Amino acid sequence: MSVTVFNPRIDDAAASDITAVTPVITALNELSSAQAPVEKAATKKVFVTTQGCQMNVYDSGKMLDVLGDSHGMEVTHNIDEADVLLMNTCSIREKAQEKVFSELGRWRKLKEKRPDLVIGVGGCVASQEGDNIQKRAPYVDMVFGPQTLHRLPELYDQSHQQREIAPKNRIGTVDVSFPSIEKFDFLPEPRVEGFKAFVSIMEGCSKYCSFCVVPYTRGEELSRPLDDVLAEIDSLAAQGVREINLLGQNVNGYRGEKDDGSICRFAELLHYVSHVDGVERIRYTTSHPLEFTDDIIDAYAQLPELVSHLHLPVQSGSNAILAAMKRNHTIDVYINQINKLKAIRPDIHLSSDFIIGFPGETDQDFQDTLNLAKELNFDHSYSFIYSKRPGTPAAELPDDVSFKTKKERLAEFQKVIIDSTLAKTHEMVGTTTRVLVEQVANRHPDCLIGTADNTRTVMFPYDVDKMDEMLGKIVSVRITDFVSPHMVKGEIEAVLA
């Protein structure tokens, strides 16, 4: 998945940072009244393309924030008018590196036409490849990792200095180190438009699943201090955000330090967030079954702000494959967790991640995965054919499942999930659901659109003259019609918050 992030977060004050300033003449009375006015320097524009997970979407927003705060840059939708091109990369899938270099090849043509264009590569591929990116693509000016994106202004300045010193033999700047979680100390105050926001509460992962590159590209788990997380959420809520999505590679493994030095675990954090004025809905991703503890499950009984949707990756329905993946839990443990949650929230909607065709996966292993999907009736899933990732333990295993078999199994599995998605959306008709109202429908100007707890888009008619006052409200909508697998239509019943 590749998403271009257009998030204009730059305030007017930041734009003044790059205004040309009239030289100061210290000798009094020497300033000529006839002095010609100095024109403002043109505002630089930045274009960001984002691959991969929601953590990357969050990071891309922060890239825009830091460059706006430091250099007054503005985001652009048009790559042809950009002064800076940033690619935030993902290395989860096979051939991720080649996709990056393919896109960079297209960007090279732009730079040939505009030599002053600055190109930067960030994210997990940048962490993996490091200075190899500039060896293969010497026209790249900046390479930075997820933990060093706060240093973008410095890297940008260094790239300009390199041009001035050695325009023909320029050496780009590379910073893919794993400092502590310091980047959050250097990021500007969060700015957002809309009623939803991501908040990163931790970085990295220490689970070391055999197939996964995340511990190698984002480092070990590091949790942000509790006060820092709550301060960011307070700021977002003050800007009108109603839904907070807590992010982390292993988000429910959060262990943030409190003022007194004690540790705040994830379930306790959920309670703190629920008490922030203005926050009406809480989501989180991505979770690990090992950290999905009873106190988190109990929170679903205690906190109405927690949406009735859970994304809990399981990866396979076979205990043998889970062991090979080093997931360190069994299917029985996973099913027991889900059953406990359903006892508390019968209307909970589940989604998960699945890897099909992992090395050693037999027909029975795959059948176990199909059986799990049918038993738990997942709402949707992110399912992929296994991709060998260099440097991971699984890459050393014999890849003994043919590509043809992998494709056939994936198609069969995805049909089970698609059928479940369709059935669950149809089941919404005649029920009432909670919706965050977000915008006027583009194609139906007499209707408002919002998101239900279960991630479905909900459209409902409303008085055109009063639509603005409904934006950002939490409403109850009775569903009347199925529109598509991920969209329904209904009638508003009440304003809840």
Curated annotation (Swiss-Prot):
An example Gene Ontology CC term for this record: cytosol
Chief localisation class: cytoplasm
E.C. code: 2.8.4.3
SUPFAM superfamilies from the UniProt entry: Radical SAM enzymes
Domain Radical SAM core: 191-423
Protein's UniProt keywords contain Protein biosynthesis: no
Domain MTTase N-terminal, first and last residues per copy: 44-161
TRAM domain location: 426-494
Keywords: 4Fe-4S, Cytoplasm, Iron, Iron-sulfur, Metal-binding, S-adenosyl-L-methionine, Transferase, tRNA processing
Sequence positions that bind [4Fe-4S] cluster 1: 53, 90, 124
Catalytic activity reported: N(6)-dimethylallyladenosine(37) in tRNA + (sulfur carrier)-SH + AH2 + 2 S-adenosyl-L-methionine = 2-methylsulfanyl-N(6)-dimethylallyladenosine(37) in tRNA + (sulfur carrier)-H + 5'-deoxyadenosine + L-methionine + A + S-adenosyl-L-homocysteine + 2 H(+)
Cofactor(s) the protein needs: [4Fe-4S] cluster
Annotated PROSITE patterns: MTTASE_N, MTTASE_RADICAL, RADICAL_SAM, TRAM
Residues where [4Fe-4S] cluster 2 binds: 205, 209, 212
MF terms (GO), sorted A to Z: 4 iron, 4 sulfur cluster binding; metal ion binding; N6-isopentenyladenosine methylthiotransferase activity
Cofactor annotation remark: Binds 2 [4Fe-4S] clusters. One cluster is coordinated with 3 cysteines and an exchangeable S-adenosyl-L-methionine.
Keyword field contains tRNA processing: yes
Localisation: Cytoplasm
NCBIfam families the UniProt entry points to: miaB-methiolase, MiaB/RimO family radical SAM methylthiotransferase
Family: Belongs to the methylthiotransferase family. MiaB subfamily.
Function, as annotated: Catalyzes the methylthiolation of N6-(dimethylallyl)adenosine (i(6)A), leading to the formation of 2-methylthio-N6-(dimethylallyl)adenosine (ms(2)i(6)A) at position 37 in tRNAs that read codons beginning with uridine.
Assembly behavior: Monomer.
Protein's name according to its UniProt entry: tRNA-2-methylthio-N(6)-dimethylallyladenosine synthase
